[in-house]
Each structure stands twice: as structure tokens, then as C-alpha cells.
């Protein structure tokens, strides 16, 4: 089985300089949805590109065969541009880059039905209002497709529409492609004409209208996003996740969340995030591409491409940047920013700190206002803080530097040299007190 994805259109009605198939749906480009699904049912996947072909090509996996339709002259013409992809002894599935939610199950049903002996298998659906769609007309054992504009009056009551998804026998498709003409109002070559050449046609019906919805406008894309969002939320609710306010909660379809986790309002969980069991997320929190363990609490914070182990507390108003690893039972408090750093088990950074390019051991206390000065104007340098160290408030650790195990840094210090284990590091001027100085100064004035 081969799958050919037609994705050459510009998407004029999207009013965008970005190719239509690259517009994201639930966090990933529409074409990525289709290619991933195609890869689950077909041994080889090809994509026909057109507008901004090179830009779209960059988003595709290396295992996808790419063909280019220089001039968009219809669906059959697009398939003709990929005729080298079609093998006489193999079947080919036709998909569309702007119909992103076609399901693996439906495609498998089509393939199974096709293998009962067919030139072509059509995916159809019944619509209450089929206006604008080509109708699938059955005449005994045969089927044909008539475009809406060409329907005679007596057939306008037919509600079975052609979705545009097909499985073709490779032999049949190669034979009929040269016979398709562009004798229509638009002067284009339509794949529906190939169906009308077929002697053996089989039909599969879908009742899920989401999976056959094509995106031609931003309005449709937003509608599809909302439907997908609510479908995901309902799935999570049914599997033991509490979502206190679905109307203000945005969860991408790729997200996984364990049971007994509570999601508060105004929470955004995106990308390939996995959240464990019995967590509390939000309110007003954004999490992107993170791995989160069990019993984690994150509130009013942002977390990007980070790993958060069990029993960790984050926030409020914390920011975890890419490369952050929070080990078990660590605590990250308000207005703490962490970037490309590992925070050890049981370590606390509770207030007003920046930790960048650092490796922090177990049970370290990082006082309020601590800064790792990691950038020297040319490159980022590492800071090492070993187990059990205590960093006093308002300290600056100028990297590269190492704070030894059990060492103590006095508050207000600027540390530029390594501090050995169990040592006191001070990097500040001695305090001077001049008694009565203020009164003396006033008398002089």
C-alpha cells in the first residue's frame, strides 16, 4: 500500500504568505497530521507540493517521497505529477494536506474494503445539506460521481457526498490517468473522472464529519481547532482528569495527562507534554513539550522543554526554559528563572533568582536574589553547586565557578573563585559603622 498526499495548493482564501498546509492545528502543521496518519497504514508515502514547495519540504520526514506540481491544474494533474510513485502491482491511497483529521481507522476500513476486489474505493458521507459537494450516485452495482453544478433536478435530494478520499488499484489508475480530460469550466483535470471510468467500485462511509473537513479559510481552521480541543478535553475527563473550566483550558491533542490530575482555568498545555498522576496545574500556566512526573504542583508559571520529576513544586511566577531538569522534591518559587540547568533532589530556589547553565546538587538552599552570572560577553559558562551548599541571599556567582559540598556563601557576596567544600565564601566589603555621624553632619550644615 502506498499513500499519496496532495498538498500543492496555495490556499488563497487563507490570506497568508504561509502555505496553507503549514498552518498549525493543535500545535503542529496540518500536513504533519496527514503524513503521520498515512505512515501508519502505508509502506510508502509520497507528497505532491506546489506553492512554496521547498518551505513545505523542510517540514517533512526524510522517508517521504516528494513531487512538485509546478502549475495547479486539478487533482488528477497532481497525481500525474507523481506517476512514478504509482506501481502497477500496488494500491495507492489518495489523501489531502488540508484535510488533517482523517483517521487511521477509516483508512484501514477503506483498504480492507478495497482488497475485496475493486478498481477504486471511495470514502463517502451523508450530509443534511450536501450543497456544493459532488454526489455519489449508485446505479445497481455501479457508482458514479456527479458534481453539484451538474446534478439533474431529480438527483438533488441525494445526500451522499464524495469526500475526495480514494484507494485506487495502481494498474487501474495508471491506465486511466492519460484518459482524463480537462473539458470543464475550470479547465482542470479531476480525479473524480477516474472514478467514473471504473467498473468495480466499492464504498466506505464515515459518520465523523471532523475527519473529512477541509480547511480553506482561517474561520474553518479555528472551528476545527475548537472541535479538536473539546474532543481532547472530553477524552481526558472520561479518563480521570479534572478540568475545572474547559472553556478557558487549551490542551493540544498530543498531550498525555494521568488520572487524578487537576487542571485549573487559563491553563495551556501544548506539544508533546506528558503529565503524571495526581498533579495540580494552573491557574494561568503554560507548559510546552515538558515531561512532568507524579504529584507535581505548577501554578502561574511557564515551562518549556523541561523535565520535572515527582513531588516538585513550581511557582507562582516561575519560568523554566529549555534544558531545565528539576529532580525529585525540589522547589522553585516565585520569580525564579531557570535555563539549561539541573536542580538536584530536595533543592530549593524559592525567590527572585536566575539560574542558568548550572548544575546544582541535592539539598541546596539558594537564597533570594541569587544570580548565576553565566555570560562573559562571548560564551555561556557553567556554575557547579555541590550537595548541601547554602547560597546566601543577593549573591552573584560569576561563572565558571564551583561551590563545594556543604559550603556556605555569605549574603550579598560576589563569588569569582571556587569555594572548597564546607568552607565559607565571602565576596563583599566589610561593613563600616560610624556612630553619631548623621548628627555631626547635620551640625556642620
Swiss-Prot record:
It catalyses: alpha-D-glucosamine 1-phosphate + acetyl-CoA = N-acetyl-alpha-D-glucosamine 1-phosphate + CoA + H(+); N-acetyl-alpha-D-glucosamine 1-phosphate + UTP + H(+) = UDP-N-acetyl-alpha-D-glucosamine + diphosphate. Its cofactor is Mg(2+). It is an enzyme of class 2 (transferase). It holds the Pfam family NTP_transf_3. Acetyl-CoA binds at residues 368, 374-375, 393, 411, 428. It comes from Thermotoga petrophila (strain ATCC BAA-488 / DSM 13995 / JCM 10881 / RKU-1). Mg(2+) binds at residues 98, 216. Pathway: Nucleotide-sugar biosynthesis; UDP-N-acetyl-alpha-D-glucosamine biosynthesis; N-acetyl-alpha-D-glucosamine 1-phosphate from alpha-D-glucosamine 6-phosphate (route II): step 2/2; Nucleotide-sugar biosynthesis; UDP-N-acetyl-alpha-D-glucosamine biosynthesis; UDP-N-acetyl-alpha-D-glucosamine from N-acetyl-alpha-D-glucosamine 1-phosphate: step 1/1; Bacterial outer membrane biogenesis; LPS lipid A biosynthesis. Binds 1 Mg(2+) ion per subunit. UDP-N-acetyl-alpha-D-glucosamine binds at residues 6-9, 20, 69, 74-75, 96-98, 134, 147, 162, 216, 321, 339, 354, 365. Its main location: cytoplasm. Residues 1-218 are annotated as: Pyrophosphorylase. GO terms for biological process: cell morphogenesis; cell wall organization; lipid A biosynthetic process; peptidoglycan biosynthetic process; regulation of cell shape; UDP-N-acetylglucosamine biosynthetic process. One of its GO terms (cellular component) is cytoplasm. Its EC number is 2.7.7.23, 2.3.1.157. This is Bifunctional protein GlmU. Catalyzes the last two sequential reactions in the de novo biosynthetic pathway for UDP-N-acetylglucosamine (UDP-GlcNAc). The C-terminal domain catalyzes the transfer of acetyl group from acetyl coenzyme A to glucosamine-1-phosphate (GlcN-1-P) to produce N-acetylglucosamine-1-phosphate (GlcNAc-1-P), which is converted into UDP-GlcNAc by the transfer of uridine 5-monophosphate (from uridine 5-triphosphate), a reaction catalyzed by the N-terminal domain. In the N-terminal section; belongs to the N-acetylglucosamine-1-phosphate uridyltransferase family. In the C-terminal section; belongs to the transferase hexapeptide repeat family. Keywords: Acyltransferase, Cell shape, Cell wall biogenesis/degradation, Cytoplasm, Magnesium, Metal-binding, Multifunctional enzyme, Nucleotidyltransferase, Peptidoglycan synthesis, Repeat, Transferase. PANTHER family: BIFUNCTIONAL PROTEIN GLMU, NUCLEOTIDYL TRANSFERASE. Residues 219-239 are annotated as: Linker. Homotrimer.
Amino acid at each position: 500500500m502506498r499513500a499519496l498526499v496532495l498538498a500543492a495548493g496555495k490556499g488563497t482564501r487563507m490570506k497568508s504568505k504561509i502555505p496553507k498546509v503549514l498552518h498549525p492545528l493543535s500545535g503542529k502543521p496540518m500536513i504533519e497530521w496527514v503524513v503521520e496518519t498515512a505512515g501508519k497504514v502505508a509502506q510508502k508515502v509520497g507528497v505532491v507540493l506546489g506553492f512554496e514547495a521547498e518551505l513545505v519540504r523542510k517540514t517533512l520526514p526524510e522517508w517521504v517521497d516528494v513531487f512538485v506540481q509546478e502549475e495547479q491544474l486539478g487533482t488528477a494533474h497532481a497525481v500525474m505529477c507523481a506517476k512514478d510513485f504509482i506501481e502497477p502491482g500496488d494500491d495507492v491511497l489518495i489523501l489531502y494536506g488540508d484535510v488533517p483529521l482523517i483517521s487511521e481507522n477509516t483508512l484501514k476500513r477503506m483498504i480492507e474494503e478495497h482488497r475485496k476486489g475493486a478498481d477504486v474505493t471511495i470514502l463517502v458521507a451523508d450530509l443534511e445539506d450536501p450543497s456544493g459537494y459532488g454526489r455519489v450516485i449508485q446505479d445497481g452495482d455501479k457508482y458514479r460521481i456527479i458534481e453539484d453544478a451538474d446534478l439533474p433536478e431529480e438527483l438533488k435530494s441525494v445526500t451522499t457526498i464524495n469526500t475526495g478520499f480514494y484507494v485506487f488499484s495502481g494498474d487501474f489508475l495508471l491506465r486511466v490517468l492519460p484518459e482524463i480530460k480537462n473539458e470543464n469550466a475550470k479547465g482542470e483535470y479531476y480525479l473524480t473522472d477516474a472514478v467514473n471510468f471504473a467498473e468495480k467500485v466499492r464504498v466506505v462511509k464515515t459518520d465523523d464529519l471532523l475527519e473529512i473537513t477541509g480547511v480553506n479559510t482561517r474561520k474553518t481552521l479555528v472551528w476545527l481547532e475548537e472541535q479538536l480541543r473539546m474532543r481532547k478535553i472530553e477524552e481526558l475527563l472520561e479518563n480521570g482528569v479534572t478540568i475545572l473550566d474547559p472553556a478557558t483550558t487549551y490542551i493540544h491533542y498530543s498531550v498525555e495527562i494521568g488520572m487524578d490530575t487537576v487542571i485549573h482555568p487559563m491553563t495551556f498545555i501544548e506539544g508533546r507534554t506528558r503529565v503524571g498522576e495526581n498533579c495540580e496545574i494552573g491557574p494561568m500556566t503554560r507548559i510546552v513539550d515538558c515531561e512532568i512526573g507524579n504529584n507535581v504542583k505548577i501554578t502561574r508559571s511557564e515551562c518549556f522543554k523541561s523535565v520535572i520529576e515527582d513531588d516538585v513544586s513550581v511557582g507562582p511566577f516561575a519560568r523554566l526554559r529549555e534544558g531545565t531538569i528539576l529532580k525529585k522534591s525540589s522547589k522553585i518559587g516565585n520569580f525564579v528563572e531557570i535555563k539549561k540547568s539541573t536542580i538536584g533532589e530536595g533543592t530549593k530556589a524559592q525567590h527572585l533568582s536566575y539560574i542558568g547553565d548550572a548544575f546544582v546538587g541535592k539539598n541546596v538552599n539558594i537564597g533570594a536574589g541569587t544570580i548565576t552570572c553565566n555570560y562573559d560577553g562571548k560564551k555561556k559558562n557553567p556554575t557547579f553547586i555541590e550537595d548541601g551548599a547554602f547560597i546566601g541571599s543577593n549573591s552573584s556567582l560569576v561563572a565558571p565557578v564551583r561551590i563545594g559540598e556543604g559550603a556556605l556563601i555569605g549574603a550579598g557576596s560576589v563569588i569569582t573563585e571556587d569555594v572548597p567544600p564546607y568552607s565559607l565564601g565571602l565576596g563583599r566589603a566589610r561593613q563600616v559603622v560610624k556612630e553619631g555621624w548623621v548628627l555631626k553632619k547635620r551640625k556642620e550644615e
